């Protein structure tokens, strides 16, 4: 095989790890995927075995080489993208985690988050980190591990332990302990990092009693962090030179380099991120302020809205209600529905995310009649995803005083043409679906490739991931607003139901 050079992206997700090899045109040459165990010690708790994650990553690296015939010395650089917020604490000498990784979804630290709120820290944390106080972020997870593993606090203070999000853990393992680093986008999700001053926040560390010695060094999203130890990369010493949390990597992979550009990834949940440029903008309306990416000595901020249930609502139709045999079938049924959209599904199975942040809300359905069919119910479930996206897009426009013209989309549910057309209709703007839906891995590859000169600059990248399809709005204004008003009523009723005591 010719000695063509490639970039490898490692995409470490919530349920599986993947390795993807990309060529110079940004095309996928090969990929390998491996699922790993989800651990649920108690209701609402979600954990992973960090060593099992590492083993799965080693396995998919090998799989990507085997499938493509590409050799380790043909990999110019490695980019890493990861499930964000998930927290690992390990022993510096042995490299062994002292507890399972606590996953972003896990609610086991909710009492600690509530305690911080009741102590009056909400505003302080928001101003420094851009985040709301929530168990979602890493800070309370680190504190929980130090509290619940015997001797951990003392060992952390002695400098015997290290903390990292998954990116940090993987770089540490790949370099055989030579690099203990993270990047701006992952640091910004810990609730320990001051995103204005770009440093770990001493006051927050003191409030939570987390020793600074355990924290990784924070670096930009596109630079060489270290090289793979040859025995961890099949003989190759390859620079690891790009890193970003999954949603920020997707923003970069979608080429959303200009302020005002917005992308939405329709995955298990839905994550909408807007590039707000070099000015940090705190949301007045419950969106998160975070770092999009930092390259070439500049940091670009972002606003983010998280929807907990998106693609997983379609999985619920399939696995929970058995209304469809596979996810793509939901599109066919939705098109067969002939009602007037008076049914509303509010899929608040784990509470409502942005901009409501109501963790007590639960799923509900409104507007059922004797004539409601399976097709109507499926259509209403798909529409609920689009309504939630509108909630966030409207909020972003209020926060930034800008009119969003186009929404760039990717992720599994973005393949559903019915959903994409309804999304365009209910927003009244164009929906641009990426040609290459692997935008998360592609973003990590782009960041890595830029750092080593594999791609020259952002202008060269702009030629690599064009729009695959454009969905334009076709619904009249009064119909659009009437439907959305019904959705707002349904959400309000859902929240009222959650508040009523017996």
Swiss-Prot record:
The keyword ATP-binding applies. InterPro entries: ATPase_NBD, Carb_kinase_FGGY, Carb_kinase_FGGY_CS, FGGY_C, FGGY_N, Glycerol_kin. Pathway: Polyol metabolism; glycerol degradation via glycerol kinase pathway; sn-glycerol 3-phosphate from glycerol: step 1/1. ATP binds at residues 14-16, 268, 311, 315, 412. It comes from the Bacteria. Glycerol binds at residues 84-85, 136, 246-247. The phosphoenolpyruvate-dependent sugar phosphotransferase system (PTS), including enzyme I, and histidine-containing protein (HPr) are required for the phosphorylation, which leads to the activation of the enzyme. GO terms for cellular component: cytosol. GO terms for molecular function: ATP binding; glycerol kinase activity. Key enzyme in the regulation of glycerol uptake and metabolism. Catalyzes the phosphorylation of glycerol to yield sn-glycerol 3-phosphate. This is Glycerol kinase. The lineage of its organism: Bacteria, Bacillati, Bacillota, Bacilli, Lactobacillales. The gene is glpK.
């Amino acid at each position: 095989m010719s000695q063509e050079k490639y970039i490898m992206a490692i995409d470490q997700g919530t349920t599986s790890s993947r390795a993807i090899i990309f060529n110079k045109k940004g095309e996928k040459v090969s990929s390998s995927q491996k699922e790993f165990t989800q651990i649920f010690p108690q209701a609402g708790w979600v954990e992973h075995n960090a060593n099992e994650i590492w083993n799965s990553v080693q396995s998919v690296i090998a799989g990507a080489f085997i499938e493509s015939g590409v050799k380790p010395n043909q990999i110019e650089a490695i980019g890493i993208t990861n499930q964000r917020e998930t927290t690992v604490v390990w022993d510096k000498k042995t490299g062994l985690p002292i507890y399972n990784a606590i996953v972003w979804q896990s609610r086991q630290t909710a009492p600690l988050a509530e305690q911080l709120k009741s102590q009056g820290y909400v505003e302080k944390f928001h101003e420094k980190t851009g985040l709301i106080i929530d168990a979602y972020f890493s800070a309370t997870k680190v504190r929980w591990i130090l509290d619940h593993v015997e001797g951990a606090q003392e060992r952390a203070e002695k400098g015997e332990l290290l903390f990292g999000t998954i990116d940090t853990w993987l770089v540490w393992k790949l370099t055989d302990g030579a690099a203990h680093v993270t990047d701006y986008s992952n640091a910004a999700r810990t609730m320990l990092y001051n995103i204005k001053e770009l440093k770990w926040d001493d006051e927050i560390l003191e409030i939570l009693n987390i020793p600074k010695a355990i924290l990784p060094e924070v670096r930009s999203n596109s630079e060489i962090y270290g090289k793979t130890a040859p025995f961890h990369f099949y003989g190759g010493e390859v620079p690891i030179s790009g890193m970003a949390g999954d949603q920020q990597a997707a923003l970069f992979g979608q080429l959303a380099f200009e302020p005002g550009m917005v992308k939405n990834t329709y995955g298990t949940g839905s994550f909408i991120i807007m590039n707000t440029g070099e000015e940090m903008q705190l949301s007045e309306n419950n969106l998160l302020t975070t770092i999009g990416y930092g390259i070439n000595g500049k940091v670009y901020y972002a606003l983010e809205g998280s929807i907990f249930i998106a693609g997983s609502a379609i999985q619920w139709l399939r696995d929970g209600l058995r209304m469809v045999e596979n996810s793509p079938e939901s599109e066919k049924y939705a098109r067969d529905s002939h009602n007037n959209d008076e049914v509303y599904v509010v899929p608040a199975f784990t509470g409502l995310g942005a901009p409501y942040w109501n963790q007590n809300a639960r799923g509900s359905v409104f507007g059922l009649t004797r004539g409601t069919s399976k097709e109507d119910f499926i259509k209403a479930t798909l529409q609920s995803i689009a309504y939630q996206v509108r909630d966030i897009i409207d909020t972003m426009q209020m926060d930034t005083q800008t009119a969003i013209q186009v929404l760039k989309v990717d992720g599994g549910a973005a393949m559903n043409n019915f959903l994409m057309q309804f999304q365009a209709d209910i927003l009244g703007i164009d929906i641009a679906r990426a040609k290459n839906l692997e935008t998360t891995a592609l973003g990590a590859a782009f960041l890595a490739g830029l750092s080593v000169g594999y791609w020259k600059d952002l202008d060269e990248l702009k030629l690599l991931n064009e729009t695959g399809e454009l969905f334009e709005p076709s619904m009249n204004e009064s119909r659009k607003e009437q439907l959305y008003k019904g959705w707002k009523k349904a959400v309000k009723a859902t929240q009222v139901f959650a508040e009523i005591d017996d």
